[in-house]
Amino acid sequence: MEAENEAHCCPGSSSGGSREYKVVMLGAGGVGKSAVTMQFISHQFPDYHDPTIEDAYKTQVRIDNEPAYLDILDTAGQAEFTAMREQYMRGGEGFIICYSVTDRQSFQEAAKFKELIFQVRHTYEIPLVLVGNKIDLEQFRQVSTEEGMTLARDYNCAFFETSAALRFGIDDAFQGLVREIRRKESMLSLVERKLKRKDSLWKKIKASLKKKRENMI
């Protein structure tokens, strides 16, 4: 159950043959996606970030004693469908949908981002976690923890409340997403193995029937 950063902001390709995970950060502008990302990668809270800028970050960590190379795309906050957005929706292996617990509208917009993923991938079975950020601003909270948990149940995904300012829950969110990607890959691999066994059995049955017909001639 461990996760430790081995390198911060690692440029270039993954090293040491680590599995690469393409992660996309989604959420309305101003919810703290960039701050969450920067805290995870460099343990730093940015003083300022332009919410209209999209950027990419890379880091290598260990999760459950397995190396993981994360390629993280921090997107702008507009929940609109564009050609560029379609590309990263299609290429992303896992998604973190963020909202601010101090902004109810950002919570309501979380559903729009979930639908954007569906529009491109045509399935809801995509690794995803829901993150309610800015819990350090408790006095300004507009979205309860229970509401976040309910939405996560609707999404059938893990839910985390975080504070980028205090670096609380940040690692948990990224670890949770990588574990979900691994879980779904493991399930898919199991299904593929079962299908191969069924196909092999079917071929054996057909071969046996063919041999029986030949013996009858």
UniProtKB/Swiss-Prot annotation:
Annotated positions binding GTP: 27-34, 74-78, 133-136
InterPro entries: P-loop_NTPase, Small_GTP-bd, Small_GTPase, Small_GTPase_Ras-type
GO cellular component terms, A-Z: cell body; cytoplasm; cytosol; dendritic tree; Golgi apparatus; membrane raft; neuron projection; nucleoplasm
Disulphide bonds in the chain: none
Reactions mediated catalytically: GTP + H2O = GDP + phosphate + H(+)
Nucleus found in the keyword field: yes
Keywords, ordered alphabetically: Calmodulin-binding, Cell membrane, GTP-binding, Hydrolase, Membrane, Nucleotide-binding, Nucleus
UniProt activity-regulation remark: Alternates between an inactive form bound to GDP and an active form bound to GTP.
UniProt-listed Enzyme Commission number(s): 3.6.5.2
Subcellular location: Nucleus; Cell membrane
Pfam families for this protein: Ras (PF00071)
GO MF, one annotated term: GTP binding
Keyword Lipid metabolism: no
GO biological process assignments: adenylate cyclase-activating G protein-coupled receptor signaling pathway; intracellular signal transduction; maintenance of protein location in cell; negative regulation of neuron projection development; positive regulation of MAPK cascade; positive regulation of neuron projection development; positive regulation of transcription by RNA polymerase II; Ras protein signal transduction
Function statement: Binds and exchanges GTP and GDP.
Description of how the protein assembles with itself and partners: Interacts with AFDN, the C-terminal domain of RALGDS and RLF, but not with RIN1 and PIK3CA. RLF binds exclusively to the active GTP-bound form. Binds calmodulin. Interacts with PLXNB3.
Family: Belongs to the small GTPase superfamily. Ras family.
Other facts noted in the record for this chain: Shows rapid uncatalyzed guanine nucleotide dissociation rates, which are much faster than those of most Ras subfamily members.
Protein name: GTP-binding protein Rit2
Organism in which the protein naturally occurs: Rattus norvegicus (Rat)
